[in-house]
C-alpha cells in the first residue's frame, strides 16, 4: 500500500508539473508574439484606433433597481474572464438604465477590461447580441473595424507583454485601478488588419493546444485522486493484503 501511495504521489507531482508547464509555454509563446510585433511595427495610441473608451456606472447612483430577466444584462468584472465572457451568474437592471447611461450601452464586438480589483486587466470581447450595460469596474473599448480587431486587442491586453507594461515591468506588483486615460494613452503595436487576424488565428491554435493539454492533465489528476480514495476505502475495509 505504501508503495502504491508513493507511486500515486509521484504521478500527481508529474501531472501538476506538466499542467503548469503547459500554461507557462502558452504564456511565453504569446509574450514572444507581441514582443516581436512591437519590434517590427510602429505603435499607436489606443484612442486613435477606437471610437469609444469609457466605463459604466452604478445603478444605485442612477436610482435604478435590479430586476429578474428579462431586463438589461448588467455586466460586471465578475463576468469578464480571460478572453471569454463568464455568464453563469448574471445580473439584470431596469431598461431605464440604458436611457440614463447611454454611453456604456454595449454593442457586439466591444472589448471589455476590468479596471478595479483583483482581476484588473482581465479582458474579453462582448460577443453576444443581448442588450447590456456595464458597471464602473469595467472599461469599454470600441475598435475602429478597419484599424483594430477586437480579438487582437483582447489577446494583447491579456498577454504577459501588457502585464509588464501595466506594472512598469514589475509583474508581481499590485495595482489598485486603471484610469480611462491610461487606456487612451496606451500604445498598441499595430500591424494591418490582415496581419492582426493572422496573429489571432495563431494564438487561437496555441490556446486550443494548451486547453487540450490542461484538460488531459486535469483529468489525470482527478483519476489519481479517485484511485487514492479507492485504495483508502479498500484498506479500511480490509480488502488489501
Language-model segment annotations:
Residues 47-64, 78-108:
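Sequence-specific dsDNA recognition surfaces
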Residues 59-60, 81-92, 111-135, 151-155, ...:
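Short, ligand-facing micro-motifs at secondary-structure edges
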Residues 153, 157, 196-199:
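Interdomain signal-transducing alpha-helices
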Residues 73-76, 112-114:
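Short hydrophobic-aromatic micro-motifs
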Residues 3-6, 10, 14-58, 185-197, ...:
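Non-catalytic DNA-recognition/assembly elements of restriction-modification systems
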